[in-house]
Amino acid sequence: AFSVFFFEPKTIQSIFLRSKPLYTNSTINRPQNASIITVALGLYFLIQLVLPLRHYFIEDDVLWTEEGHRLSWRMMLRTRSGTASFKVIDKTNNAVIPIDLNQYLTTKQKHNVTTKPDFMWQFAQFLKQEFATKNKDVEIYVTAYVGINGRPLRPFVDSSVDLAAEPWRLFKHSRWLLPSK
């Protein structure tokens, strides 16, 4: 395997790279777009480094809030259990519309919606769109309790916040999540 280093470049060229001409100039020509490639690769590697570490820049405990947990360098050595109920209120007449999660979600989806904040928010947005197709403007409130690693369930979401009106903050802490302590 190391014998390649003892042959002349012309010999290696004639054996392995017959169709490619041998480059014999003493100077190496730098491509015109080398700086663009360097910047692009630098940004790519920066993203690959920062994305898994973003949970250090988001306030509160990532184990509790789940913010910044996915695609991070953390081990999933925890289990979450919880319950959640969604209350939909029609803005025109303040009528409460009951939501049965079984009508909308599978068992696995229901587990995710009741324990993970991004799923709760997405389901609230889905319900908002569902009622918008029926020409109803609604507010959606969630009462959720979550327990981690077999601990007792604790309040997880501020039930006075309308999740239908909340924006999703990808790299920031969501105000509607209650603190871990």
Can you annotate each of these PLM segments?
Residues 46-71:
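Hydrophobic alpha-helical transmembrane segments in integral membrane proteins
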